[in-house]
Each structure stands twice: as C-alpha cells, then as structure tokens.
Amino acid sequence: MLSTCNSQLDGILFSKPSKIVVYGIAGSGKTNFLLNILKCSKISNENIVYISTEDPVFINRAIELGLESSNFYFASALSQEHLISLILDSMQFNVITIIVDSINHLYRVESEKDYASKLFVDILVLLDSLNKKGIAIITSAQVKLEENIIAGYEYLNIWADKIIEIKVLPNKTRTIRIIKPAISHEIPFVITSKGIEWLYKT
C-alpha cells in the first residue's frame, strides 16, 4: 500500500492508481517527498521502480533513509530515449508504482532539439498506458524559476490526474498544496535526517 505517512494526504493521492505530478522550485523537497513515499509504503510481493533523470545525489539520500528493500529498483536516465527504455524494462518486474524524478528535466535539456517535444509526449503516453493497467505513476517536475511555472505545463496539466505544489516558507517549513483537484487546505512539513516530518500528522 502506497503511503506518505500522512493519512489525509494518502486519501487524496492514493485512493486509486493515479498519475501524480509534484512540483516546486529547486531545493523545495520534491526528491525527499518521493523518497518518503518509498519509506512509508508497505509492499510485499510487488515492486516500486524509481528512475532519476538528474544527478545521482538521490542515492546517498536513499541510503541515509534506509531504502535498501529488495522491492525497490533504482535507475538513472541519461536522455528521454533512455527514460523510455528504462520504463519499458521495468515491466519485467511486478511493478505497482513507477516514480520519475523529474519527468521534465531531460525535456528541458533537449528542448532545442526538434524531436524533444515528441519524445516528451511519447513518455507521457507510455506512462498513461501503464497507469490504465493499474500502475501508479508519481513524478516530480521542475519549474521555470522566474515564473514558478512547470516546464511542459501545457502537456502535464492535461496528463496528470493530480498535481501538488511544494512551497518553502521563510522559516524553512514546507507546505503541500493540492492544485489538481483544487483543495484549499495546505499540509506543512519539515525535512529531517530521518525523512519528512509532518507538523500536523493525521
């Protein structure tokens, strides 16, 4: 069972296998949030695949959090084509969830190439087809810092079932706000050496 260790948030995100996008500025805690899902989820005979498209720093954090279960598979994608290949390869496992951190990084890196948009759409279509088979898709997304707008928003807004924003407050507390579906309530948390600590845990 997928979990964030916050039952209120779990009820919103994981009532059924969905396509979820988590966005926020660099350093807001997107990767920590995704790794926290691994830490909190209770799975036995199924597997979660975690694919990073950025630097391998997440590996150190995963080790620090004790995420060494045989039910977790970690990989790094070097291009959008490589990401497609890794997603397809993950089907050899009994997968219940695919996490991509982040879904639009390689799209931004390759944006000047003619085929970049097509490959990005191909990735979303592939993930959509897997979601229809009952696999949860959870992704982070980078934003354009000066505008706080998701890169590839025109695609991701249509594709995603649920979109959440992570914001950093002046006191370093983070808050989660549900953008899609629109829910006004915000859920605060802090990041510690042991993972995410919910300030008002339910």
Q: Model-found features: residue ranges?
A:
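Pre-Walker A adenine-sensing motif
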Residues: 3-15
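Phosphate-binding/switch region of NTP-binding enzymes
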Residues: 130, 135-202
